[in-house]
Amino acid sequence: ETVLVTGSKINRTLLQTIPTHCSVIDVPSPADLMKSKKNKTELKGFRNAMLKDGKALVKFYMWLEKAVPTGEVTELTVEEKLREFRSQQPLYFGESFSTIAGYKGNGAIVHYRATPESHLKVDPEGLLLIDSGAQFMDGTTDITRTVAVGALTDQIKLAYTHVMKGHIQIATAIYPQGTRGSQLDVLARKALWDNCLHYSHGTGHGIGHFLNVHEGPQNIRLEENPVALQPGMVTSNE
C-alpha cells in the first residue's frame, strides 16, 4: 500500500499513524491543484461576491470621507463599519479574516491588528491601509487598498503612484501558458525598483471559494513557486 503525504504540511502525530508496512511518498497534494481551478459555478459566485463587496465598500468609503473630519474615526471603528456595510449584502456569512486597518505607521506592519488597548485615531492627514474581506455563501473576497484621508507629502504621493502602476501591470498582464506567479511578480515591483523602493511581502495569493481566504498552491511573490497560473485560478492582486 502507498500513502501520499505533503511533508511540509503534515504533523508528526498524523504521520506516525501510517502503518509501517505502507510506502510513504512525499508529494504536493493533488487535491490542492484541483481545488484551485474553479468551475463555472464557482467563478460566477466569485463575481457575484465581488459585486456585493464593491457595493459595501462604496458605502464604506462615503462614510469614511464624511466621518474622518469629525475626529471620531479610529482603526477599530473602521473595522466595525466595514462589517456593518458588508452584513447588509445578500448571502453574507462573515469576515473572511480579521480586518487590518492600519493608520500611518501601523499600515506598514504586516498583519497588523488594532486592539482596544492599542489603536490609533484616524486624523484628516496621511494614509490609511485597509486589508479586509468577506465570506459570502457564493464566494470569498480579499481586498487591500490604501486610502488618502487627508494631505499627503510628495514622497508619499510618489510611492503611492508607483504601487498603483504595479497593481495595473498585474491586473492587465497578458502572459503565455506555463507562466508562474514569481515571473509576474516583477511587474508589480518594477516602478518601485526603478525608484529604489521595495516591499518584502508577497503580491498575491490564491483564494478559496467560501473556504480559506489564503489558498494554494499558486501565488504571486518573489520566492520561486513551480506552480503555473492556470485558467480558473482566483488570485489576489494586493
Model features per residue range: what roles?
Residues 1-238:
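Active-site neighborhoods and metal-handling regions in enzymes and metal-associated proteins
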